[in-house]
């Protein structure tokens, strides 16, 4: 396996180091190449993501990312120039966010054993394509537009992926949208879900408006198995799912090219937390859980299961203790 590693900013390098410690314990011999991308490189060279680096990344089987973001860089520069460019250049059209409440984890819904779902979010369309603009800026008559792009091709490929995952899980899929207001995109999503669903007669299909889905995710999260949704709604509902499952610090994600033409990228969804960087207190659990997603994506199912079970054992016994960053990695690696 050839793995590209982007530690990034803030606590990113710290949590990534512990994730690699666990990866080495469960699957020794991975060929790793580290890339210096983020605020430090931007300040030193003015570069965000050179074309040459993109070409190098394409030669890897997967990418492990720590975190990107620094207050010394204007808002949006790193996000669009690095994170979103990676997503679009490598065609990461599937954003995968598992939501599971592990035993022993503190949550508003702690003790509910039925919280185990996955959100399949479209990753390269919607309002994040940068289409839109503004006129009469700074005047009382300013007009700003953000265009949400939804293509049949883009919707279909993420819907097919969601149905495949539902078939392997509990055979239930929920489309989350706002079809009563966003009628054009809503009809496209609804029609394609219905069309694809005919090829999966064993998968039960449901629909929820995004506002209703947020209510049910809190009051009855056990109803969800696989959720498929667009880029914007997925961005919102996955953070709610993280809160339901114990917080953003336990949220792993995968940015996936379903065609496997390009390497997929796996990362914890928490930010770079520059205020605690270098203190050794950042929780690397989400980064370690991202390694489990990475392994599963590359067909290393046994290794992925071992990591997931080691994390589960660690969380079940941790209680209110908050070990140092390196200690978390050492405990989980030792359990392997």
UniProtKB/Swiss-Prot annotation:
<feature type="site" description="Important for catalysis">
    <location>
        <position position="178"/>
    </location>
</feature>
<keyword id="KW-0560">Oxidoreductase</keyword>
<dbReference type="GO" id="GO:0009098">
    <property type="term" value="P:L-leucine biosynthetic process"/>
</dbReference>
<dbReference type="Pfam" id="PF00180">
    <property type="entry name" value="Iso_dh"/>
</dbReference>
<keyword id="KW-0464">Manganese</keyword>
<dbReference type="GO" id="GO:0003862">
    <property type="term" value="F:3-isopropylmalate dehydrogenase activity"/>
</dbReference>
<keyword id="KW-0028">Amino-acid biosynthesis</keyword>
<keyword id="KW-0520">NAD</keyword>
<feature type="binding site">
    <location>
        <position position="121"/>
    </location>
    <ligand>
        <name>substrate</name>
    </ligand>
</feature>
<dbReference type="InterPro" id="IPR050501">
    <property type="entry name" value="ICDH/IPMDH"/>
</dbReference>
<feature type="binding site">
    <location>
        <position position="211"/>
    </location>
    <ligand>
        <name>Mg(2+)</name>
    </ligand>
</feature>
<feature type="binding site">
    <location>
        <position position="235"/>
    </location>
    <ligand>
        <name>Mg(2+)</name>
    </ligand>
</feature>
<keyword id="KW-0100">Branched-chain amino acid biosynthesis</keyword>
<feature type="binding site">
    <location>
        <position position="87"/>
    </location>
    <ligand>
        <name>substrate</name>
    </ligand>
</feature>
<dbReference type="InterPro" id="IPR019818">
    <property type="entry name" value="IsoCit/isopropylmalate_DH_CS"/>
</dbReference>
<protein>
    <recommendedName>
        <fullName>3-isopropylmalate dehydrogenase</fullName>
        <ecNumber>1.1.1.85</ecNumber>
    </recommendedName>
</protein>
<keyword id="KW-0479">Metal-binding</keyword>
<dbReference type="GO" id="GO:0005737">
    <property type="term" value="C:cytoplasm"/>
</dbReference>
<keyword id="KW-0432">Leucine biosynthesis</keyword>
<feature type="binding site">
    <location>
        <position position="239"/>
    </location>
    <ligand>
        <name>Mg(2+)</name>
    </ligand>
</feature>
<feature type="binding site">
    <location>
        <position position="97"/>
    </location>
    <ligand>
        <name>substrate</name>
    </ligand>
</feature>
<feature type="binding site">
    <location>
        <position position="211"/>
    </location>
    <ligand>
        <name>substrate</name>
    </ligand>
</feature>
<dbReference type="GO" id="GO:0000287">
    <property type="term" value="F:magnesium ion binding"/>
</dbReference>
<dbReference type="GO" id="GO:0051287">
    <property type="term" value="F:NAD binding"/>
</dbReference>
<comment type="pathway">
    <text>Amino-acid biosynthesis; L-leucine biosynthesis; L-leucine from 3-methyl-2-oxobutanoate: step 3/4.</text>
</comment>
<feature type="site" description="Important for catalysis">
    <location>
        <position position="128"/>
    </location>
</feature>
<comment type="function">
    <text>Catalyzes the oxidation of 3-carboxy-2-hydroxy-4-methylpentanoate (3-isopropylmalate) to 3-carboxy-4-methyl-2-oxopentanoate. The product decarboxylates to 4-methyl-2 oxopentanoate.</text>
</comment>
<keyword id="KW-0460">Magnesium</keyword>
<comment type="similarity">
    <text>Belongs to the isocitrate and isopropylmalate dehydrogenases family. LeuB type 2 subfamily.</text>
</comment>
<comment type="subunit">
    <text>Homodimer.</text>
</comment>
<feature type="binding site">
    <location>
        <begin position="271"/>
        <end position="283"/>
    </location>
    <ligand>
        <name>NAD(+)</name>
    </ligand>
</feature>
<dbReference type="InterPro" id="IPR024084">
    <property type="entry name" value="IsoPropMal-DH-like_dom"/>
</dbReference>
<dbReference type="InterPro" id="IPR023698">
    <property type="entry name" value="LeuB_actb"/>
</dbReference>
<keyword id="KW-0963">Cytoplasm</keyword>
């Amino acid at each position: 396996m050839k793995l590209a590693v982007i530690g990034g900013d803030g606590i990113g390098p710290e949590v990534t180091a512990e994730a690699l410690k666990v990866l080495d314990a469960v699957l020794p011999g991975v060929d790793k190449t580290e890339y210096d991308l983020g605020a430090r490189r931007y300040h030193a060279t003015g570069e965000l993501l050179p074309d040459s680096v993109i070409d190098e990344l394409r030669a890897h089987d997967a990418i492990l990312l720590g975190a990107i973001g620094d207050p010394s860089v204007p808002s949006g520069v790193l996000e669009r120039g690095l994170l979103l460019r990676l997503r679009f250049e490598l065609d990461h059209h599937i954003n995968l966010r598992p939501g599971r409440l592990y035993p022993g984890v503190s949550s508003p819904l702690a003790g509910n054993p039925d919280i185990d779902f996955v959100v399949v979010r479209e990753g390269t369309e919607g309002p994040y394509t940068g289409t839109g603009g503004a006129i009469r800026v700074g005047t009382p008559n300013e007009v700003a537009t953000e265009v949400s792009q939804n293509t049949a091709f883009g919707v279909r490929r993420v819907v097919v992926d969601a149905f495949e995952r539902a078939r392997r899980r509990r055979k239930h899929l929920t489309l989350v949208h706002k079809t009563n207001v966003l009628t054009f995109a809503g009809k496209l999503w609804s029609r394609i879900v219905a069309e694809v669903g005919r090829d999966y007669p064993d998968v039960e299909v449901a629909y929820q408006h995004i506002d209703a889905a947020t209510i049910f995710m809190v009051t009855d999260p056990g109803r969800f198995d696989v959720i498929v949704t667009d880029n914007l709604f997925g961005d919102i509902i996955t953070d709610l799912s993280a809160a339901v499952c114990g917080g953003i610090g336990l949220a792993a994600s995968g940015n996936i090219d379903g065609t496997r033409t390009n390497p997929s990228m796996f990362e914890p969804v928490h930010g770079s937390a520059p205020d605690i960087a270098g203190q050794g207190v950042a929780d690397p659990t989400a980064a370690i859980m991202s390694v489990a997603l990475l392994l599963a994506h590359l067909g290393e199912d046994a290794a992925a299961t071992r990591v997931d079970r080691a994390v589960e054992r660690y969380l079940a016994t941790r209680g209110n203790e908050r070990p140092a960053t390196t200690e978390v990695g050492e405990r989980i690696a030792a359990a392997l």
